[in-house]
Amino acid sequence: MKLTRLSSLLCLGAALVSGSLWADNLLGPQTPPSRPKNIVIMVGDGMGPAYTSAYRYYQDNPSTLEIEQTVFDRLLVGNASTYPAPVSGYVTDSAAAATALATGVKTYNGAVSVDTDKRPVPTLLELAKQRGMSTGVTVTSQINHATPAAFLSHNESRRNYEALAESYLNTEADVMLGGGQKYFSGKLIAEFEAKGYQVLKDAALLDDVTRPKVMGLFADVQLPWAIDEPEARRLSTMTAKALELLSQNDQGFVLLVEGSLIDWAGHNNDIATAMAEMHEFAGAIEVVEQYVRQHQDTLLVVTADHNTGGLSIGTHGEYRWDSQVLRQINASPTQIAKQALAQDEWQGGVSSALGFTPSDEEFDLLDKARMQGEQVLTTGLKKLIDQRSNTGWTTGGHTGGDVQVFAAGPASTLFAGHQDNTDIAHKLISLLPKPIKAKPKPEKAQPDAAQQAIEVKTETEPKAETKAKDLLDSQILPEQNAKPAIEVKPNTKLLENDNQGDANEALQQAQELLSEGAESQSTAPVSQVDSQDYPLASS
């Protein structure tokens, strides 16, 4: 009996020790992580967990018994909630989600790095610039779309595309690559060139660029679908060039990379195009992953801003998903529809593009759709592909589920487990270099008590406010007289996000001065437009 009890206790002790060791291994090193020199944050727009799972099966080699891992499987560390500010409920749009990732602040749907009171809040890229780092964005949408705009600028509505484009003159970003020619007039481009930017409209010219600053506008709006130009690998090419250019700064860099069109394909409920966009994004991640291996001072964080489309791998109660159908498709349904409308004998071209021959009944349905024009035929082709692959969708909009977080490099363990999307921003901002302090001024001789009384009596409220702002500037900005990208006020949470003792002390002193009676000045107004007006096709 005693032996049995002793054995049980020993087994229990061994289990507890084993569990403790397992937890330690799971959580990683308990010592504080090292601070990276460079940060790359990559956003798969609309890339919910179903997309990464579907991509795994899409990439699976059917000739092997094993299902091969993808870059997403290798780098997975956690997940994140995505809800916006309470005024917008539980389901976010891209602008509010990007604001959370860029600033650590929840806001209303449609807002571009302004809070719910429409006041600008400082972004990761702005703070990096203030610390002497280089910054850049590479995207497959227009560069003034919701996600890149939230990292670069501020506006009460994501729909103010022209205003956002103009505001980029003040960002001082070193690299901006994507689409958006439509929103940059010749006059505006001339202003960028006057500020030293090389402005390109042909992606092939990127090879000749050897230094920042560069702005690439490679399409009227978004870049072409990856499925229609699979050899272009534009996001990988732009990302590699951005890394090359930004790494010229010894102070480090912060780069945003977005696979923008995953979301657009999801809104269209277009599984074939979505998987091609996932492949494009995965290729760009692998470019950065390789860079991280070669530059061990670089942190990579990958996530999504939200889920799009309610993608379902299998539907109608049938336990099947045929990825082989998708791998054979060599053009987007939009492109297939255009070609079918341009030809009298269209059936052969459709079969060739789909990689399979529709049945007579399916051809009859497509023919009826063709009679109604390109949009109806495109929808018919997408439904046919969904039926053949057994893919399901629940919406043409966004859903409110959590998204995955992937990371590699120094401090990547910070992103393990569950977190909110604002936590990702807080962690990234805390990893930026410490703000450069201004040189201390020589202390003045202390006046006598009578003189102090006179000074206290005559000091006005505006002077107290000026002292507070001067103190903030001297503690936060790189140079004593440097002008911040936006007005930085205590309610922006800039200081608490930095997690710097000196900065917190500066905030406390500034707030004490402000409490003497000075009122904060309001920030400059942003363009007026309905903040909730955003079409699904480009959310």
Question: Model regions: which residues?
Answer:
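A glycine- and small-residue-enriched flexible loop/hinge segment at structural boundaries
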Residues: G89, D93-T116
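A post-motif C-terminal structural segment
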Residues: P36-N38, M47-S53, Y57-T99, H145-K444
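Gram-negative bacterial Sec-dependent N-terminal signal peptides
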Residues: K2-W22
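Active-site-adjacent structural elements in enzyme catalytic domains
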Residues: S34-I39, A50-Y51, R56, D117-R131
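Cleaved targeting-peptide boundary
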Residues: D24-T31
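Long, low-complexity, intrinsically disordered segments
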Residues: I476-E479, K483-S539
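Asparagine/serine/threonine-enriched low-complexity, disordered tracts
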Residues: Q446-K469, Q475-K483, E487-K489, K493, ...
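Extracytoplasmic mature domains of secreted/periplasmic and thylakoid-lumen proteins
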Residues: K106-E166, E172, G180
